[in-house]
Structures are given as structure tokens and as C-alpha cells.
Amino acid sequence: MKRKLFWICAVAMGMSVFPSFMTQATPATQPLINAEPAVAAQTEQNPQVGQVMSGEQGADAPIVAQNGPSRDVKLTFAQIAPPPGSMVLRGINPNGSIEFGMRSDEVVTKAMLNFEYTPSPSLLPVQSQLKVYLNDELMGVLPVTKEQLGKKTLAQMPINPLFITDFNRVRLEFVGHYQDVCENPASTTLWLDVGRSSGLDLTYQTLNVKNDLSHFPVPFFDPRDNRTNTLPMVFAGAPDVGLQQASAIVASWFGSRSGWRGQNFPVLYNQLPDRNAIVFATNDKRPDFLRDHPAVKAPVIEMINHPQNPYVKLLVVFGRDDKDLLQAAKGIAQGNILFRGESVVVNEVKPLLPRKPYDAPNWVRTDRPVTFGELKTYEEQLQSSGLEPAAINVSLNLPPDLYLMRSTGIDMDINYRYTMPPVKDSSRMDISLNNQFLQSFNLSSKQEANRLLLRIPVLQGLLDGKTDVSIPALKLGATNQLRFDFEYMNPMPGGSVDNCITFQPVQNHVVIGDDSTIDFSKYYHFIPMPDLRAFANAGFPFSRMADLSQTITVMPKAPNEAQMETLLNTVGFIGAQTGFPAINLTVTDDGSTIQGKDADIMIIGGIPDKLKDDKQIDLLVQATESWVKTPMRQTPFPGIVPDESDRAAETQSTLTSSGAMAGVIGFQSPYNDQRSVIALLADSPRGYEMLNDAVNDSGKRATMFGSVAVIRESGINSLRVGDVYYVGHLPWFERLWYALANHPILLAVLATISVILLAWVLWRLLRIISRRRLNPDNE
């Protein structure tokens, strides 16, 4: 009986546990009969990779505040891909890439790649494809279908925003096949063309960041942002000379950080900006939106929220007076590495060593040989990999007054390494300067030291052992590109269908050593002036001293917003060329104070009365009236230097018009024959707008040359008119050669006279020696 009761209890307990066990063991998925709808629903949420589709909005978007401001940006390949923007992906060079950044105070919530590409009609469908990577993560695959062959194809691919970082690289990899067996990767039928109108659609959302100066200059300048840095400057009213100097220092420092991106500094008087901005305020003069801020007892730099928008930040430069603001500005330019917290007090900025001429950080040093490692702008710049390695480029920013006329060449000591060719062939390294070929060197198949002592020809031909190589005259400008191309003769498979030879191609690797050097230390500084091209390309002659310590800027009394904007944009542009702020710039509003000064003069707004009658001025813009001098013969090309007779002023024309106009003129300083004056003039607010646009636009600056640049709605017209003067120093024999270089007939006459005189002297000397030898008693 007890045994029966035991079994009954055991069965009852087992039945009570069974339902809970069944609940835990139930499969997470639905039964097989319902699996197909579930998979379909999942496919709708996560589209199948490789599908050419319109893209899903908001997929994988990061979680951010819903009420934050956002902006939509379309980045075309024409903007962010290497020039010209389009890409031709081939069998031996299947990769192409674009790069873009993301500001640290923003996050991407949506991203979509829009492709416009044309595949070769010889490709095998489906087997050929385009793989898309973001930061080396595979985002998707676009297969080439039969209908797409030889036709322009439009496709979209969504990008997961979670993979987007501060710096991003989208890499396209072409996998192409044109036959099933015995393919040649170098076949000309293997290609896929990606159009320059392809692009990337991004939605950025702004983050509400803390007021913390330890991240400075973010958010006022973010190196991850490839756009022109537009940074308004806010004043209580027309600034005094001291405040003009302080704001110029800040603008030049931000210009030195902006570099190739460009910069723009809109000026506001007692207005609230609508974006991140710099505000200057003293205890007595401050914008109305800061009237309740407590007075300060020292130079203070503080980061605050915009009164109406917490997503916008203001950097307020406070001081008791303009002297404090000047000290605070120097603190921004030279002491920002110590910034932290919401505010800092600038106690002292003390210079320890004076700057030297031509020591701008962005310029190649001319006092000693420079290593290529010093010229690098990013890691891995001096190396390349691939079946056909991409070219290695080195930028050389030089002072525009470097005198190379009688130079025999520029010495380079190149140390390089490369993947050795398997056999001795015609693989080589080509060296070019400013897209002009210099020389090539064979790549040996033997292990040996690869070091070259090369002299870049500047104006003379290059002698290479057995052969005279004819080199066109190479003219170095302010910005130069030195390029190394490694050309490999890669063995490729071949054969027939029945007897096919195949193997896996191996990438080649090339490296230019960081210890390679180039030497510009043996050359003089000498340049004919006026030359607005030197100003437009390098900020010369003001940039000769990187801190602008030998520059005086003459401003109007009580300048308006447009005139202040011209000052800030000009010094910002010069800072971008030199890489150093204008901490020692002198600003004045009294034109009489420049008399007798040993300094280069920058005039903004209007030429002082004492200079208006100077015979060297070739353009004057004043209100609705303007006049200009035109030369006897005008040359349309900047590189052609006309004769003195062609430059002579033939006519002076005076006109009156209500249309806007601006101009830039250069002439010799009447107070020092080694100094120059450059004036930036405009006749109206629209004229200043065109002038600022020309200063900020590198393409428009490239059209400036000579002594006069007239800026109108139609564009910029430059003239070479008036006298030439020379700035710099040459030894007397170099100066004589320079003077005779443009007068070959006179040079030939002088050479003939010199030969005759030398022959006569030698003849007389030989007669004296002969007479003494024949008549020793007459000594």
C-alpha cells in the first residue's frame, strides 16, 4: 500500500513540474510553417546586401536628442574625391576612395551613398561586382547585371551611421571578370567608371556640448570639418586701433589653423550672431547681449552659451580695456595649450626669442637642408602599395622671392626602398616637379643600397652620363609638387583555354625614406616688384616675417563692418600661408605715422592723402570716381614678364559710375626703397563684398598679378604697368648678370669687349715677359 502511495505522489509531482518545463523549452522562433512570413518581415527591416534600392530612412541611427538642430549635406565625389572627382577602377588598380570628416559636436543620424557608374560591356554579369567599404567595414555589394553592361547605372546604398567616426574613408573595390578562364588582370576591357556626380547624403545632428576650453579651438574651428571656416567676429561698435590689432591676431591664428580649407570672418557691430562666434568686450564697451555680465579685473577668455540657442557657443574675449584684449588675443594665439574649464585668465604672454625672416612654419626652411620627414603632412604619405603603386607627392611651399636664375640645380639626397622586380626589366622610378618630368631611374632586381644624389634642374639642362636630357626651364613658385612615380612591369598570365597559365598577382610596396633631404640653403632672396601674384599666392612681402612684425596696416578712422572684414580676411589668409599668427602686426588709423618707417605697408579702405599724388600709384578707387593707368602693351599671362617699355604707363583714364568696383594695387614705398605698399580698395559695400570674396577665393587670387588687379562683377583683370623695383640682395656679379639677362645683344657686345680687353691684357703681359727674357740686363 505504501509503495502504491509513493508512486501516486511521484506521478503527481512530475505532472506539476511538466508545464513549467515545457514553458522554458518552447523554441524562441515560430513553427516552421510560419517561418517564411517572419523571414520576409525581417528582410523588409534589414534589406538584403547587394540590392540596388532606394534605401531605408533611419536604419541603425544613433540615439540622440530629438529636439537638436540638424542639417542635411550632400557631398559629391567632385568635392571629396581626388581630382577630377570621377574614378576609373581597373583590373590592376581596382580601388578608389573618398574621405570625409565629422565635427566633434555633431553626429550623423542618416547616411546614403548615391552611385552613378558605368560598367564595361565586356564584364561577366553577377561575377563582376562593386564592393563598398566604410572604414574597412563591408557596407554592401553591388553586383553588375546583364542589363547594366555599358550603360549608366544609378544605385543607392544606405550606410550604417554607427560606423561613422571623426575621420572616414569610403573605399570602392572593383571585382571584375570578362571570361571564365585565363583572364589577364591588365586587360583594357576590365573597367568600371564611377561618375563625379556620385555623392554621399548625410544628416548631421548638433550635440549640446559643455562649455569646456580644454577642447579649444573646437567648436570654433574643427579640423575634422573640411568646409571653409566661417567665424563671425562681434564688436560693440567700430573698434579702436588696439582692438583692431587684437582681432587681427585672433583672425590670423584661426587662419593658420584653417590652412587649405579657407577662412571667412564676417563682422557684426552690436548684433547677436546665429552661429559659433568670437565676441570682444571691455567693461565700458560691450555688445548689448553682454550688458549684464560682471566686470572683469584682468584679460579673460570665456566660453558661454548663445543667449537664445544653447547649441551655439560664443568665445568672449573680455578685458578692462583694449590693452587687456590685446594680451588676451596673444594668449589665444600662443597659450591655448593651457586652456581648460569655462574660462581662463591670461596673466602674461612674454616673448623669449624674436622671429627671423623666412621662418614661417608652412615654408620649407632655407637655412639648411630639410628632410622629407619634416615635409610630411600625414603618416604614410611617403609610401604606397599596389600592383601599380599610387604616386608619392611632396609639397614644397617656398618663399616667392627665392632667386634661382643662375642656379645649376637643387640638390636632393633620396633614400628609397621598393619591392624588387623578379627579373631585370624596365621597371623604373620617375621624378617630376610641377607636372614636368625630370628624370627616371631603373628599379634593380638585385639587393643593393638605393640612394640617389640628384640635382633638380632649374633653368639649365640635365646631363645624365651618356645622354643629354633636354629639360624645359622649371620655375619654382610659392607652392610646388614633387612627385615620385614607381612604374612596374608586372608579369601577367596568358595562354589559351586549353593551356592557361594563371597565378596570383602580388602587390608592390614603395617607400621614400624620411631621411631623404632637399637643400634650398644656397640661394639668395631677390624679386622684382610690384608682384601681386606673390601677394596672392603667399602673402608676400608681409609674410617675409611670419609674425608680421615688419608690417604696418593703415585703416580708416571708425572703420565699418566691411572694412574690418577686409582686414580680418586678409590677415587670416596670410596666416593660412605662413602657419603663424600675426602677433606683432602694427595697426594705425593715422596715415602720417608711416612716414620714414622701415616696414611694408598694407592699406585698407583708402589711400592716405599724402600718397594719392605719388606717381607710382596706377589705380585709385574713391566713391563713384576711379582712374587707372594702362600700359603700352599688356601680356595676358602671369608668367610672362614684359619689357620695361611695354610696362610704361601710356594712358590714364578717369571714369564715374554707380556700379561697384574694388581693386588691389602694389607700388614701392616712398619711405624705403626696399619696402612695398599694397592697398586693398573698394568704392561701396558691394565693392567690399567683391573684395572679400576675391581675398577668400584661391581661384580668384590666382588671377591676380602685376601691379594692378581690378575687381568687378565680371571677374578680375590684372595689369602690369609702371616702374619695376627690386627687393632683396644679390652680390654685384649676380646683379650684373641679372641686369644683362634680358638684353642678349648688349650682353654679346659686352662679352666681345671683355674678350678683346682680356686678349689685349694677355698680349701686353706676354710681350713684357718676352722682353725681360730676351734682355735680362734691362731689368
Question: Over which residues does each language-model region extend?
Answer:
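Hydrophobic helical h-region of N-terminal Sec-dependent signal peptides
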Residues: 9-15
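C-terminal segment of classical bacterial N-terminal signal peptides
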Residues: 15-24
